Amino acid sequence: MASACGAPGPGGAGPGGALGSPAPAWYHRDLSRAAAEELLARAGRDGSFLVRDSESVAGAFALCVLYQKHVHTYRILPDGEDFLAVQTSQGVPVRRFQTLGELIGLYAQPNQGLVCALLLPVEREREPDPPDDRDVSDGEDEKPPLPPRSGSTSISAPVGPGSPPAAPETPTTPAAESAPNGLSTVSHEYLKGSYGLDLEAVRGGASNLPHLTRTLATSCRRLHSEVDKVLAGLEILSKVFDQQSSPMVTRLLQQQNPAQTGEQELESLVLKLSVLKDFLSGIQKKALKVLQDMSSTAPPAPPQPAIRKAKTVPVQAFEVKLDVTLGDLTKIGKSQKFTLSVDVEGGRLVLLRRQRDSQEDWTTFTHDRIRQLIKSQRVQNKLGVVFEKEKDRTQRKDFIFVSARKREAFCQLLQLMKNKHSKQDEPDMISVFIGSWNMGSVPPPKNVTSWFTSKGLGKTLDEVTVTIPHDIYVFGTQENSVGDREWLDLLRGGLKELTDLDYRPIAMQSLWNIKVAVLVKPEHENRISHVSTSSVKTGIANTLGNKGAVGVSFMFNGTSFGFVNCHLTSGNEKTARRNQNYLDILRLLSLGDRQLSAFDISLRFTHLFWFGDLNYRLDMDIQEILNYISRKEFEPLLRVDQLNLEREKHKVFLRFSEEEISFPPTYRYERGSRDTYAWHKQKPTGVRTNVPSWCDRILWKSYPETHIICNSYGCTDDIVTSDHSPVFGTFEVGVTSQFISKKGLSKTSDQAYIEFESIEAIVKTASRTKFFIEFYSTCLEEYKKSFENDAQSSDNINFLKVQWSSRQLPTLKPILADIEYLQDQHLLLTVKSMDGYESYGECVVALKSMIGSTAQQFLTFLSHRGEETGNIRGSMKVRVPTERLGTRERLYEWISIDKDEAGAKSKAPSVSRGSQDPRSGNRKPAPAEASCPLSKLFEEPEKPPPTGRPPAPPRAASREEPLTPRLKAEGAPEPEGVAAPPPKNSFNNPAYYVLEGVPHQLLPPEPPSPARAPVPPATKNKVAITVPAPQLGRHRPPRVGEGSSSDEESGGTLPPPDFPPPPLPDSAIFLPPSLDPLPGPVVRGRSGGEARGPPPPKAHPRPPLPPGPSPTSTFLGEVASGDDRSCSVLQMAKTLSEVDYAPAGPGRSVLLPGPLELQPPRGLPSDYGRPLSFPPPRIRESIQEDLAEEAPCPQGGRAGGLGEAGMGAWLRAIGLERYEEGLVHNGWDDLEFLSDITEEDLEEAGVQDPAHKRLLLDTLQLSK
């Protein structure tokens, strides 16, 4: 019989030959696996089927069949003779077919080996837009009447490989306006009508295509006259250098026959173009010879002037005040004023203090004596500076700057000073400039300095730092009519004039008038490698039109960068088409490492920047928009911004970041001014309204636990040639070197290992096939894959939970064992099916937090083709040999964020791995390196406490949220102004939020309640982890994202506006007192029964539900056809385990065995914090039976011989011996300390039944 299992087969016949013409309704070209499953789910009837292209084998197909609400997938592979066959199990004869139609016809009959016969073909959903609705609906791309276009006829060869030549410029006519790309109108008519006539002619044996020939001749008719003009001009130029040249062009023009047929016209045009090519080459050779002859008799040229050195950074001074406590202020009398002078070139910081008698007192600190900068998050213009006074002693001074911008400028100058005088051969951090501009098909003005220097509106750089050159400049333009070479020269000349540096062009890629250019400092040219360019068309049939994207990627030493510049579909109502443009670009743009072809470009690069004219508009009345803009109130407008809305629905730019927008909409201005928006346009079809919008955007996505900060994001206000304003963004990006181990290559004795204890994934699919995982990383010699999963279950027809134990997972061996190398590495995972070898989801995990002697938990999200498809969690560790534990401080770890300065003078500053400036919605602050050497941490592990319990893990800090420092309960306080050493755990996870005894960030604060149970001391030092999400700026609600350093402070998934939140576990529902029949929330047990128990501590009230239908359906097939499928996968997957495992309670943290405590974000399955290795045993008895077996312990003695008998004997006495293994494993092996156990500890040990928890706690209470 036909089988769904097998290895990938060879490529073969393409779909065109296999299908025949026209394509049948059941064939879906470019349909994703997830979309196919949703179409079949909507059909809902057994035997529904469709055929799509295979995602794993080029030229192959996938037959998807629905049977009993499950989707079964069969691969259809071509053989060497282009015959097609369904992949079968071993031993089953193979049936071969010439076309897919024949294959489907056979398998439509019963008993042919499939799970059922093919009965009901499923057609693809029709697009809402009519087929003749072209991509120029709002007139955005029309050429302006003023200023006129340049009359230059020079054609510059493109720099990037694969770029099309620039088309010769033609006069603007009404016909050209209706067809911006020159072919769209005529070609569209051919595709609608004449295409079928040519097809019939070919079937009749014709060897030519008369209608296509006529179409091409008509389209190129104007090109004839243009070529004639160019040839005539070149003939005159040729005679300047060669008087004897023959008038060949004149004869050629005279030979033209005005009554030529379409085919003769094309032949004549090809001949002219060939002559034109020879003429251009000949003129260059003749001119070179003549000029060489002239130069041989000319006087010698004067010597070239010496190359100017780059401009030096002048000494900058900052006026500050010393921030002192109230007590110090009374002693001093008034606050002290200082002047901080930064000498970048000299590597010095001078503190100048003016005293009352006009005398000056100054202190000079060299760059190596400035130990740390600590930004205050509460006071935006406050900065703490830690100086080295003498050996091993530091002093912290807090300064108040004039403004937050001055503080940022001071920090940037000090970082530049550190970088200049660093002893490292390779940089740890570079500065990247991103610029995007729709030029409106007119040449740029002579002066675009404001764009290059990030001056204008929004978040801009301080004037002190605008002249500091960036390491990399990336310019993305749309509707750029300037030739590639001319544009590149213009950019280099502008940068040369601004910085005195001759920037090197790394790549230039063009598609029509969409261009991206990358230039780097000369000193970095040899650090760039693996340059790749690509382009994608997104017009009609992804072929015609003027929309699309261009991209560039490269390696900067050991860090991969990707840059995508796009121009998406225009029109207020074209949101869905813009979304599809984005998904097409994500899937089809070919950039980066070819070995990572299983991953889309959002996961192939350490840092991916996506920018351009995205064309998303504002959904608001024009007058309201104008009123808000006039009042500079952008918050209401950002709430109706289409890009923000689509991102909140997880439809586009999944877990990308964008800096907060604080500048006015960049489109559509009156040309020549920035005071008026040209929103009213008269068109032949009527009046067109182009509302002011933020069409031009810059977004980015970075791997978890990497460093990236957006220092500016705004637009210019003095470049007025286009109806768009140029936008800019500057970024501070951490980079890694091409690591060379001082110890040499790893030997067997000192090999590092990446070991997995278990992995569990929840995958969005209606299939019930088996899965395996592939592991990719630059630290591995080759990719590795696991065995198929050994367990799987499903409580929801559209989701499948699959699990791998350590036996099914490989042990990975990195090529280098040094910790300094491994802490910069990442692991890419893809979950693939055994039936079709197609990916069901991909993710990235940082190794940095996994390094250690004990296993660490990771939790992140799966995505495929830009869609969220599930989540994955696991337990793993990276073992590093002791002799390879040496590491060093990174430059970007020099600045940290102090979120809570309350009592800062009486306690140590919060030395976190960085956090965020609240002014920057998605800024990633610099982490601060722990001063304790890593080798010391491994050599001197913490001693366990004498209680017999496992030691509580040390406090961890997160880049997104440093821990709130707690007052020390014992020990001497820290000396005033002296920074305390960081905690003894150097491998915290900055990609996840670390919470210590604080409520969930997204839940409303609770009023104090005297009845609330205090936080148990046993969990005092536990570290809770939740998964962050990149916020869309302060104006947008946060969402859960993968463990990415680009994420904001968020602890859960919020549903999109048009969907109600997922149902919380029953235990999280709080009824009003009048409706709650019994005290305490309802708790659902493993057997599905309900029991009542006391409300758990730290419970949070359920947030109010937005209006909308109740989310009762868990089967996607039951969703109405109008469902926009935007609800988060994790919200829908949440109900998977509510029956199997009792939830820990709302807002509660479920402790994992080991050093980390996993707090399940909202929207994840309720058992997400359950221990991976020690699940609680299944409780089959009913609650009543359990209660009948319970026996109270006598008063006056220990429960069940507590203290005399062992743990097992006590548990057997009360009938709960099943929990002995879990309790012992979690450290509760000593009955003397069992009285300290809490409800959370019981849940951690696997006691999920509320009646059993109550029995254990009551018994222990009686024994006290």
UniProtKB/Swiss-Prot annotation:
Compartments (UniProt record): Cytoplasm, Cytosol; Membrane; Cell projection, Filopodium; Cell projection, Lamellipodium
One GO term of the biological process aspect: phosphatidylinositol 3-kinase/protein kinase B signal transduction
Keyword Membrane recorded: yes
Feature: compositional bias, Basic and acidic residues: 124-137, 957-971
Catalytic reactions of this protein: a 1,2-diacyl-sn-glycero-3-phospho-(1D-myo-inositol-3,4,5-trisphosphate) + H2O = a 1,2-diacyl-sn-glycero-3-phospho-(1D-myo-inositol-3,4-bisphosphate) + phosphate; 1,2-dioctanoyl-sn-glycero-3-phospho-(1D-myo-inositol-3,4,5-trisphosphate) + H2O = 1,2-dioctanoyl-sn-glycero-3-phospho-(1D-myo-inositol-3,4-bisphosphate) + phosphate; 1,2-dihexadecanoyl-sn-glycero-3-phospho-(1D-myo-inositol-3,4,5-trisphosphate) + H2O = 1,2-dihexadecanoyl-sn-glycero-3-phospho-(1D-myo-inositol-3,4-bisphosphate) + phosphate
Protein task: Phosphatidylinositol (PtdIns) phosphatase that specifically hydrolyzes the 5-phosphate of phosphatidylinositol-3,4,5-trisphosphate (PtdIns(3,4,5)P3) to produce PtdIns(3,4)P2, thereby negatively regulating the PI3K (phosphoinositide 3-kinase) pathways. Required for correct mitotic spindle orientation and therefore progression of mitosis. Plays a central role in regulation of PI3K-dependent insulin signaling, although the precise molecular mechanisms and signaling pathways remain unclear.
Gene: INPPL1
Protein name, per record: Phosphatidylinositol 3,4,5-trisphosphate 5-phosphatase 2
EC number(s) stated in the UniProt entry for this protein: 3.1.3.86
Motif residue range(s): SH3-binding: 950-955
Entry GO MF terms: actin binding; inositol-polyphosphate 5-phosphatase activity; SH2 domain binding; SH3 domain binding
